A protein has these predicted regions:
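A generic structural motif
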Residues: 7, 109-111, 125-127, 137-144, ...
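Internal mixed beta-strand/loop scaffold within catalytic domains of large alpha/beta enzymes
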Residues: 56-133
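Short helix/loop capping segments that flank catalytic or ligand/cofactor-binding pockets
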Residues: 83-85, 114-116, 143-146, 265-267
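Short intrinsically disordered coil segments
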Residues: 89-91, 121, 150-154, 270-274
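Compact, glycine/acidic-enriched structural inserts
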Residues: 127-169
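Long, charged, mostly alpha-helical binding arms that flank functional sites
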Residues: 157-213, 227-230
């Protein structure tokens, strides 16, 4: 059993609470669409490199009328990084021991006019402590109103903490969520941040400050995405629209399997395979 300190416990509790609220909000949308779909939860455990308890998590997934496939995962894991992987992790080169807790969400929607979405926030401990995460919108058929509303809500969350956050983190998302082999973006962006390091008071941003920002990212997502879904879920669509959706999902698959840091981290740390690949859509197409 993992032994958590006060900061690790607080972060884990927040991610689990946010999961519960997001799942309830998504189930409410399904009820409004005359669907009885609900999340099904599957707990999982992992072993560390020595075969001892290394934490685990809960994978939540729903297949519904509005949400064709949505997964909301929370995990809390710890152990030692493999030597070849430790060198690439902030603060792990000198000591491979780590702790990580976080929430990861991907929603693929039934109506091609409702954008897919990704949200992830996390807290890691190596010889350093930091937060990372973000949220990005992934429409097969972009709608400027949705894009503007999504970015405006994230901009407000960032501005409440640091005026440089949104310019920095939106550019980071623009650069990160990009498929180099195709020369195209994965979606219409959002924010992405990593290595938001926590310092002692007087030495830099504290745990409390960075944790407050990370909570506000989660709150911003919970506020804006259900509004976008409700605005678009009854939009009529054509076979051509569905073809665009399936082709876009193919690009999404390519990014997540080739470039996504979370996928690589999960595979390198003995994470739950079903939870790691939860981000993949139920159907996709390539032409």
């Amino acid at each position: 059993m993992l032994v958590l300190d006060e900061q690790q416990q607080a972060a884990r509790d927040w991610f689990e609470s946010l999961r519960d609220r997001i799942c309830a909000a998504f189930e409410k949308i399904e009820r409004e669409a005359d669907s009885e779909a609900s999340f099904r939860y599957t707990p999982w455990e992992r072993e560390d490199a020595e075969g001892g308890p290394g934490g685990g998590g809960v994978r939540g997934q729903m297949t519904g009328k509005v949400f064709e496939k949505v997964g909301v995962n929370v995990s809390t894991v710890g152990g030692r990084f493999a030597p070849e992987f430790a060198a690439s992790i902030h603060g792990a080169a000198e000591d491979p021991r780590f702790f990580a807790t976080g929430i990861s969400l991907v929603a693929h929607m039934a109506n091609p006019h409702v954008p897919a979405v990704h949200m992830n926030t996390r807290f890691l401990t190596t010889t350093k402590r930091w937060f990372g995460g973000g949220a990005d919108l992934n429409p097969a058929i972009p709608n400027p109103e949705d894009t503007d509303a999504f970015h405006a809500r994230l901009r407000a969350a960032c501005a409440a903490h640091d005026p440089t956050f949104y310019p920095r983190f939106s550019k980071w998302a623009e650069d990160y969520f990009f498929l180099p082999h195709r020369g195209v973006a994965r979606g219409v962006g959002g924010i992405f941040y990593d290595h938001l390091e926590c310092f002692e008071p007087g030495e830099g941003p504290t745990f409390e400050e960075n944790f407050a920002f990370t909570r506000d990212v989660g709150e911003a997502f919970l506020d804006i995405f259900p509004k976008i879904v409700r605005a678009r879920l009854r939009t009529p669509f054509t076979e051509d629209d569905m073809s665009k959706l399936l082709e876009f999902r193919g690009r999404y698959v390519e990014f997540n399997l080739l470039y996504d840091r979370g996928t690589l981290f999960g595979l390198k740390t003995g994470g739950n395979i079903d939870a790691i690949l939860m981000s993949l859509p139920p159907l996709a197409a390539w032409t």
